[in-house]
Amino acid sequence: MKQTVYIASPESQQIHVWNLNHEGALTLTQVVDVPGQVQPMVVSPDKRYLYVGVRPEFRVLAYRIAPDDGALTFAAESALPGSPTHISTDHQGQFVFVGSYNAGNVSVTRLEDGLPVGVVDVVEGLDGCHSANISPDNRTLWVPALKQDRICLFTVSDDGHLVAQDPAEVTTVEGAGPRHMVFHPNEQYAYCVNELNSSVDVWELKDPHGNIECVQTLDMMPENFSDTRWAADIHITPDGRHLYACDRTASLITVFSVSEDGSVLSKEGFQPTETQPRGFNIDHRGKYLIAAGQKSHHISVYEIVGEQGLLHEKGRYAVGQGPMWVVVNAH
């Protein structure tokens, strides 16, 4: 299995393409100049395309991924109804979901043979919409509205329209600011990082009909931390044993272990990292974590080690200006 790491740097309007080897070393293979400030990225389920959101002309761009080395070639683009903050797809590769923090909406763009062809639905009134996350069963779209302390729940119809579920939302504690999410591999639990109080909520998916309950909330900061809380990203290892979340003010990654059933998180430690870590990701083997520093203009690679999943730095690399998004593709 070969792995390619993509780093989006909006200030220099670039995507850096890296090969990740078995020892955790990165080799730069391509630098793509993007027509706009590139931020969120996601790989299509069939691994043929990389979708990226750009501003100030709000669009989703599709880049064809070379199967041998992961190199990118521009393929198509489609307009968006707001500045793209987060981008994702359904598991079948039929739709792209884009959350827009500034516009307060989530949009659905239809894909034809992997290429974006146009918006089929937009839901407004999601103040501070920060991500759109499809459930493992491909039925429910979880959409955190950060400024409203709620996660809205939509059923995705066959033609890509979003239908509010009943109940239509779950709420966090006041002032939490739900932001990004991941799901446990067993499909029974979801984890949401809250930006404004730097906590992580564990949500139990009791059934496929929207019966959801918050079963744990954990503070992700050190006990003596008294500065402004400003959490950003969250990811889980493929085996579901280790979960990580980052805070930009403290420039650290919090390490959690996950109980076997996914219901309980335990804080294991903290890893100082690049300055203002806006985004990070984990490779497909669950062996390495790559973090980007929005203010350091570098990325660091860490090896995930031991039962606790602690991080040991393997290397550091210069990228573009203001790197914000990290995606890893296996091919």
Swiss-Prot record:
Its EC number is 3.1.1.31. Keywords: Acetylation, Carbohydrate metabolism, Glucose metabolism, Hydrolase. GO terms for molecular function: 6-phosphogluconolactonase activity. The keyword Membrane does not apply. GO terms for biological process: glucose metabolic process; pentose-phosphate shunt, oxidative branch. Pfam families: Lactonase. One of its GO terms (cellular component) is cytosol. It catalyses: 6-phospho-D-glucono-1,5-lactone + H2O = 6-phospho-D-gluconate + H(+). The modification N6-acetyllysine is found at K287. Pathway: Carbohydrate degradation; pentose phosphate pathway; D-ribulose 5-phosphate from D-glucose 6-phosphate (oxidative stage): step 2/3. The keyword Ion transport does not apply. Coiled coil: none annotated. It is an enzyme of class 3 (hydrolase). PANTHER family: 6-PHOSPHOGLUCONOLACTONASE, 6-PHOSPHOGLUCONOLACTONASE-RELATED. Catalyzes the hydrolysis of 6-phosphogluconolactone to 6-phosphogluconate. This is 6-phosphogluconolactonase. It comes from Escherichia coli O157:H7.
